């Protein structure tokens, strides 16, 4: 089996890919410009990508290809009509980043809601130490409890963010981008 990694740069430097050697011959490219994809995948049975487009232009000569494995959750870079019509399966790593993205959402929200950039600068500038008052409320901030939290898309990440928002006392509303999700827990 021929396994081709087209962009190991997207995996980071701390990932050991040696186990793939047990499955067949493995070729690893740190990065692949789109114009080099057809040549690099022409003999592949499995192609592992992150963001590189997989479509008729890049896959036309890949007559042995059986699987495109995406090292991400999104697969919008794969022309599914083309791969399906050629018997090429697609797989992703759904769910690998759900907690990280939900957590990052709240990190950014707290950064903005609590004016952390302003107060970080205020303390580091020394102004806090020279202030005659103990408290400084130049920039107002508030709590989440009782606020309305809107979510666009109620997939795995949206549901996780909604759950955390409810734990903070928020009223959660959402818009389903696909029209498929009619989650009764939220408006």
Predicted regions located by residue number:
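N-terminal glycine-/charge-rich "phosphate-binding" loop or analogous flexible N-terminal tail
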Residues: 1-44
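Short beta->alpha connector loops at strand-helix junctions that form conserved
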Residues: 30, 71-72, 88-99, 176
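A short, aliphatic-rich alpha-helical micro-motif
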Residues: 40-41, 59-62, 144
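Rossmann-fold NAD(P)-binding glycine/threonine-rich loop
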Residues: 76-88
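Phosphate-binding beta-alpha-beta segment of Rossmann-like dinucleotide-binding domains, i.e.
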Residues: 86-88, 94-148
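Rossmann-like dinucleotide/phosphate-binding beta-alpha-beta segment
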Residues: 135-187
């Amino acid at each position: 089996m021929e396994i081709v990694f087209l962009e190991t740069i997207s995996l980071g430097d701390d990932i050991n890919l040696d186990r793939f050697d047990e499955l067949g011959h493995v070729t690893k490219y740190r990065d692949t410009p789109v114009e080099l994809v057809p040549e690099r995948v022409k003999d592949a049975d499995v192609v592992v990508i992150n963001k590189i487009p997989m479509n008729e232009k890049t896959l036309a000569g890949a007559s042995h290809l059986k699987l495109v494995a995406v090292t991400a959750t999104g697969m919008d870079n794969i022309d599914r009509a083309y791969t399906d019509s050629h018997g090429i399966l697609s797989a992703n790593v759904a769910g690998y980043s759900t907690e990280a993205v939900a957590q990052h959402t709240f990190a950014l929200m707290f950064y903005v809601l609590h004016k952390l950039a302003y107060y970080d600068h205020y303390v580091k500038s020394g102004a806090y130490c020279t202030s005659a008052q103990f408290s400084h409320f130049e920039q107002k901030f508030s709590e989440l409890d009782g606020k309305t939290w809107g979510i666009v898309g109620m997939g795995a990440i949206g549901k996780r963010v909604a759950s955390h928002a409810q734990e903070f006392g928020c009223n959660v509303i959402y818009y389903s981008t696909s029209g498929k999700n009619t989650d009764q827990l939220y408006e």
